[in-house]
A protein has these predicted regions:
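Juxtamembrane/disordered regions of integral membrane proteins
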Residues: 1-146
Length: 146
C-alpha cells in the first residue's frame, strides 16, 4: 500500500472522527433544548463528559461501517478489508492521542475500549459486505456472455 493510499485512508478516519464529534454535539443540543432544558452550562458540560463515550459507540458503529464499505471498493479486492483496518487504526490512534492528552478516567478508558472494538467490527463487516457484492452488474453480464 502506497503512502498516498494510506493518506487517503487517514483522511477518511478524520472524516469519521469529525462526524462522530458532530453526533455528540447534536446529541447535546437536543438534550439541552428538548430533553432537559433550563440548567446552567456547567451541568451540560458535566453531562457530555459522561455521555460522550456512549455517543461515540452509538454513532460510531454506522459511521465506521459506512467508512469500511466505502473504502473497500476503492482498489482491488485484496486491499478492501486491509483499507478498512487502516481507517480504523488511524481513527484509534488519533482518538487515543486526544484522550490521553485530555486525561481520562479508567471507566472512560473501558468505554472507549468497547467503542474501538465495535468500530473495528463495523469497519470489517462494512468492507466484507462491499467485497461480497458483485462489482458491477454490467461487468458481470459481459463476462457471462464470454
Amino acid at each position: 500500500m502506497t503512502f498516498g493510499r494510506v493518506a487517503l485512508l487517514v483522511g477518511v478516519a478524520v472524516l469519521v472522527l469529525v462526524a462522530n464529534v458532530a453526533a455528540s454535539i447534536l446529541y447535546m443540543v437536543v438534550y439541552s433544548y428538548v430533553i432537559d432544558p433550563g440548567h446552567d452550562p456547567q451541568y451540560y458540560n458535566d453531562h457530555i463528559q459522561a455521555a460522550a463515550p456512549y455517543c461515540s459507540i452509538v454513532a460510531g458503529i454506522p459511521l465506521m461501517f459506512g467508512a469500511g464499505f466505502w473504502v473497500a471498493g476503492w482498489w482491488r479486492r485484496a486491499l478492501g478489508v486491509r483499507a478498512a483496518w487502516i481507517v480504523w487504526l488511524a481513527y484509534v490512534l488519533i482518538d487515543l492521542a486526544v484522550l490521553l492528552v485530555a486525561g481520562m478516567s479508567m471507566a472512560v478508558a473501558l468505554l472507549f475500549g468497547v467503542s474501538f472494538g465495535t468500530k473495528l467490527a463495523a469497519a470489517h463487516f462494512g468492507a466484507r459486505l462491499r467485497l461480497a457484492r458483485p462489482a458491477e452488474p454490467a461487468a458481470a453480464a459481459t463476462s457471462a456472455q464470454l
